[in-house]
C-alpha cells in the first residue's frame, strides 16, 4: 500500500479531512516509497536515494504524514525516532567511542547496519 492509499482510506473512514498540501506531500512520499522498495530489491550496487525534509507550520499534519509514510514503507530496516532522542543516543555512542579513530564514522556505520531508512520527528 502506498502512502496516498492509506491517506485515502483514512479520509474515507472519516479519520482525516482532505488537505491539498498534505496530498501534494504524500505524492512525493509515494515516489520516495517506490524508489526505496525498488532499491531494496535490486541485485546491483545500491545507490543513495535523496530523502525529503518536511517543514511547515505547527498543526499542518507533518508528523501524521511521516507516520503514514513510515507505516506503509515495506522495509524491515526502518527506524522512526525523535531528533533529540537520536542526538542523545549518538552523543552517548560518541562518548563510548572516545579515543578511537573517526568515532563519528564508527557510530554512523553502527546505525546503518540496522537502518536503511531513518525518519526523524
Where are these regions (language model features)?
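Pre-Walker A (Motif I) flank of P-loop NTPase domains
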Residues: 45-54, 116
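N-terminal pre-Walker A segment at the start of P-loop NTPase domains
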Residues: 15-43
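Post-Walker A helix-loop "phosphate-sensing" segment adjacent to the P-loop in P-loop NTPases
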Residues: 70-79
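Hydrophobic positions on the alpha1 helix immediately C-terminal to the Walker A/P-loop
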Residues: 65, 69, 82
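Short glycine-rich substrate-engagement loop in P-loop NTPases that contacts/grips substrate
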Residues: 78-115
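Conserved lysine of the Walker
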Residues: 62
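Walker A (P-loop) phosphate-binding loop of P-loop NTPases
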Residues: 59
Amino acid at each position: 500500500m502506498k502512502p496516498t492509499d492509506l491517506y485515502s482510506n483514512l479520509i474515507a473512514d472519516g479519520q482525516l479531512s482532505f488537505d491539498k498540501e498534505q496530498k501534494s506531500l504524500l505524492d512525493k512520499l509515494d515516489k520516495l516509497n517506490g524508489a526505496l522498495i525498488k532499491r531494496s530489491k535490486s541485485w546491483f550496487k545500491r545507490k543513495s536515494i535523496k530523502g525529503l525534509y518536511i517543514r511547515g507550520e505547527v498543526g499542518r499534519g507533518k508528523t501524521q504524514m511521516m507516520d503514514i509514510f513510515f507505516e506503509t514503507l515495506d522495509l524491515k530496516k526502518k527506524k522512526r525516532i525523535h531528533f533529540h532522542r537520536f542526538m542523545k543516543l549518538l552523543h552517548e555512542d560518541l562518548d563510548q567511542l572516545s579515543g578511537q579513530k573517526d568515532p563519528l564514522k564508527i557510530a554512523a556505520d553502527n546505525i546503518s547496519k540496522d537502518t536503511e531508512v531513518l525518519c526523524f520527528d
